[in-house]
Amino acid sequence: MSGKEVEGVVSPADQQQPAVPEVTDITLEAARKQKIHNLKLKTACLSNEEYVQDLHVSEWSETQKQKLQAAHEKAHELLASVEGGTKWSLTEAYDIKKLMRVCGLEMSVRELYKPEDKPQFMEIVALKKTMNELKQHHNKTRTVSFTGMIDNAIAKLEKIEDELRRSQLDASEMAQVPVAALKNIEDTMNVAVVQTALLGNEEQIKAQLAAVEKANEIRNVAIADGEMAIAEEQYYIKAQLLEHLVELVADKFRIIGQTEDENKSFSKIHEVQKKSFQESASIKDAKRRLKQHCEDDLRNLHDAIQKADLEDAEAMKRFATQKEKSERFIHENLDKQDEAWRRIQELERVLQRLGTERFEEVKRRIEENDREEKRKVEYQQFLDVCGQHKKLLELSVYNCDLALRCMGMLEEIVAEGCSAVKSRHDKTNDELSDLRLQVHQEYLEAFRRLYKTLGQLVYKKEKRLEEIDRNIRTTHIQLEFAIETFDPNAKLHSDKKKDLYKLRAQVEEELEMLKDKMAQALEMFGPTEDALNQAGIDFVHPAEEVESGNMDRRSKMVEYRAHLAKQEEVKIAAEREELKRSKMLQSQQYRGRTMPQITQ
C-alpha cells in the first residue's frame, strides 16, 4: 500500500464514495474524544520536556540534578503511556470501492450473493406439485407410460428443493426450463386412447350386423315361401343397413384421424428438448462465468492480503528498530547528561543542546507513534473489509456450484420426460397404423356385403325389366290382334300396356338408383383398396365377385329354362355357348388371382 493510504489521506473522489462501515454521529464523537485524549497525552509529554529544558538553564546544583533525575523518570513513564495509550479511530472507512480499485477486483457487492439473501424456490415446489398432479391423472392408460419418469422427476425436484433451501439462489429462471416438456407430457396424457373412442362405434357395427343377419333370415324365408315382394323389400332393407354399416366403418377413419392429429403435435418433442437444453446451457454458462469471476477475485484478494501482511510485518519491524534506536539514544542521552553534570561548568552549552535534541527526538517519536497507530488501524480495517468481501465471494462460488448441480438434475428431468413422450408417440403411431389397416380390412368386408347385395338387386331389376319388356311386346301384339278384329278386350290390353309402361318406368328408376349407389360405394372403396394394395394384402375385388355371381345365376336360370322349354333347345344351346365364352374370357382376365368363397 502507498504512503497516502497508510496515513489515511484520500482524494476528494474517494471521499465521495460510501464507507464500510458507514460513518455515523456516534463514530465521529468517538473519534473526537480519542483525538482529545491523544492530544492530552502529547501535551503532557511535551510540557514535561519543556520543563526539562527549563531545568537545563536554571540553577545548577545537586538539588537541581535530583529534580532533573526525577523528571527523567517521569518522562520515561509518560512516554511509555503515550506509546501504550495512543489509539486512532479513522473517520473515513476503508470502503469496498477502494478495495476493488487497489486489488483489481471485478465483482461488486451488488453482484454477489449475501448471507441475508433468502432462497426463492417456490417455482420448484410448484413443479413438484405439477408432477404429483400428473401422477394422479384421470387417464390411467396414459399415466402408466410415464409413472417411472414422474417418480424420478419428483425425487430429483425434492433433492433440488433441499439444495436450494441451503442456498441464496433465485430458482425462478431455472424452474422455467422443464415447463415446456411438462406441458407436452400433460398434453400427451390428455390424448384419448383410440380403442376407447372406438367402443361406441363397435357397438353400433355389431347392432347393424345383427340387423343384416335378421334381414337375411327374413329374405330367405320369404324366397322359400314364394313371397317375392317381401324378399325384395328385405333386399332394400339389407342394402340400407349395409350402407349405414359402411358409414359406421368409415367413421372409424375419422376417429383414428382425430387421435392421429392430436398425437401429431408431439412429433417435434426433440425441438422442445433442444430449446430447454439451450435455456439450461445459458443459465449454466452465466453461473460458470460468475463462479470464474468470484474465484479470480478470491485469488486477487488472497494475493492482496499476503502483500498487506508482508507490508505490515516490514512496517512493524521498522517501527521496532526505530524504537530500539530511540531507547538507546535516550539512555545514551542520560549517560551524557551524567557526564555533563560532572563537567557542568564547562559543558553547559552541551547540556542545553542535548536537552533540545531530546525534546525534538521525543516530539518526533510521538509523531512517529501517531503515524504507526494510524497505519495499524488502516491495516486492520483493510483486513476487515477483505474478510467481509472474501466471505461474499466464497458464498457466491458455493451458490454457483449449487446452481450448476440443480440445472444438471433439471436437464435429466427434461431428457427423461421428452424420451417418454417420444416413446409414447412412436407407440401410438404404430398402434394407429395397425388399427387403420384392420379397419380397412373390416371396411372391405362391409363393402363386399353391400356391393354384392346391391349387385343382386341390380341383376334382379334388370331381369325384371327384361320380363316387363317381353310382356309389353306380348300385350302390344294382343292389342293389335284385338284392334284387327274389333275385339271388346282391346281396352283391357290397352290399359294393361299403359300399366306395364308405368311399371317399367318405376323399375327403371329403381335400377338407376341402385346403380348410383353401387357407383358411389365403389368410389368410397377407392382409398381402402389403395391402402390394402400398399400393405400387400391380396383380396378379390367385390366387383369381380358380383360379376361371377351374376354369371352363376344366369347359368342356373338357363338350366331351368332348358328343363321347362325343350322346344327352345337351339336358343338355349346358343346362350350356353355365349356363357361358356364369357366364362373363358373372365378366367383369362383374372387368371392367377384367388377368388375365395364369400358367405352372403
Swiss-Prot record:
Quote the subcellular location field of this record. Answer: Cell projection, Cilium, Flagellum; Cytoplasm, Cytoskeleton
GO CC terms, sorted: cytoplasm; cytoskeleton; motile cilium
Fetch the InterPro entries from UniProt: Flagellar_rod, PFR_Component
Keyword set, alphabetical order: Calmodulin-binding, Cell projection, Cilium, Cytoplasm, Cytoskeleton, Flagellum
Just give the chief location class: other
- What are the protein's GO molecular function terms? calmodulin binding
**Cytoplasm is among the record's keywords:** yes
Q: Does the keyword Iron apply?
A: no
Which intervals of the chain are annotated as region Calmodulin-binding? 335-355
Q: What does this protein do?
A: Major component of the paraflagellar rod (PFR). The PFR is a highly ordered lattices of fibrous proteins that are located inside the flagellum and assume a fixed orientation with respect to the microtubular axoneme.
Cite any additional comment in the entry. Coded by two tandemly repeated genes with identical ORF: PFRA and PFRB.
Quaternary assembly? Heterodimer of a 69 kDa and a 73 kDa protein.
* PANTHER family to which the protein is assigned, alphabetical: 69 KDA PARAFLAGELLAR ROD PROTEIN, 69 KDA PARAFLAGELLAR ROD PROTEIN-RELATED
Protein's name in the database: 69 kDa paraflagellar rod protein
Q: Which organism is it from?
A: Trypanosoma brucei brucei
